[in-house]
Curated annotation (Swiss-Prot):
Domain of life: Eukaryota
Annotated protein name in UniProt: Thioredoxin-like protein 4B
Species of provenance: Homo sapiens
SMART domains per the UniProt record, alphabetical: DIM1 (SM01410)
SUPFAM superfamilies in the cross-refs: Thioredoxin-like (SSF52833)
Length: 149
């Protein structure tokens, strides 16, 4: 289903999407097209994109073609989903140490829709961090890796 969503293949394209997406949540899915978990997430993203079209713009970003952002957002697990609103990086408290991105696939379409609604409403009120509406048991668990520690 990843063929249904627009792809960003360079740093310049990602920069342009961040700068030009106004009054909507910008969803950037970092991953690889052939990865099974990425395909599962892409299916959820593509099925919800029309329902969320007034609140969100969804793009796929290949981690191998945008190494600058992969390093900047510390994308060590794929898929990782990063959110922006009017050029501002939106953070979400998932109950984990990392609030900068969602790692893994969403369990259901409704989890993704609820998260976008919460980010959108919070951003419209000027918040840069919001509380995740997703049930903690539906959030994938992972260990943070730090270099040289």
């Amino acid at each position: 289903m990843s063929f249904l969503l627009p792809k960003l293949t360079s740093k310049k394209e990602v920069d342009q999407a961040i700068k030009s997406t106004a009054e909507k949540v910008l969803v950037l899915r970092f991953g690889r097209d052939e990865d099974p978990v990425c395909l599962q997430l892409d299916d959820i993203l593509s099925k919800t994109s029309s329902d969320l079209s007034k609140m969100a713009a969804i793009y796929l970003v290949d981690v191998d073609q945008t190494a600058v952002y992969t390093q900047y957002f510390d994308i060590s697990y794929i898929p990782s989903t990063v959110f922006f609103f009017n050029g501002q990086h939106m953070k979400v408290d998932y109950g984990s140490p990392d609030h900068t991105k969602f790692v893994g696939s969403f369990k259901t379409k409704q989890d993704f829709i609820d998260l976008i609604e919460v980010i959108y409403r919070g951003a419209m009120r000027g918040k840069l961090i919001v509380q995740s509406p997703i049930d903690p048991k539906n959030i994938p668990k992972y260990d943070l890796l730090y270099q040289d520690i």
